[in-house]
Amino acid sequence: YVNRNREKILEADLIVLQNEIPEVAIAYTIRMCSDAGRTILWNPAPARALDRDLVERVSYITPNEHEVCLIWETDESRVGSLMEQYPGKLLVTQGEKGVSVYIPGRGLQTLPAMKVEVKDTTGAGDTLNGAFCAGLARGMDELEALRFANAAAGLSVQKYGAQAGMPTLEQVEAALAGA
């Protein structure tokens, strides 16, 4: 599939991958796209051991707080120093605690989750990843895109269902304006 669609894939400015496709397809796509200078976001869910060369090749990797410990075989107390090793690349989602990233010159940044009534967390991570990419595509810097994505994820958990919970651009902008 990847070979058949190589040209179309490489036309994209940003490629999003997740671990629900075969490992060989992920590895091939990451190498192909990084060699072509494309921006790559990798959501490593479901969590499994990752090839460190592939981690180095992606632009962003977005595990949740449990997945990061499984992938890097570490405990929660070391996640902050792990984020320092991957500045601006390792974005760790933490449910009701929000999302964290280490930004050079600014240190560890944790954006708190919106205080909302949670109905269903299904799809919150997917919403965050998609909104982060949408923010980047709209010209936002990483931290601004992450704020945008965090707001989108906060809105998404207020409804039942992954797709039904995904907010519109207008809803995210309104939530940010009211924040």
Predicted regions and their residues:
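Conserved phosphate-binding/catalytic region of the ribokinase-like
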Residues: 49-53, 76-179
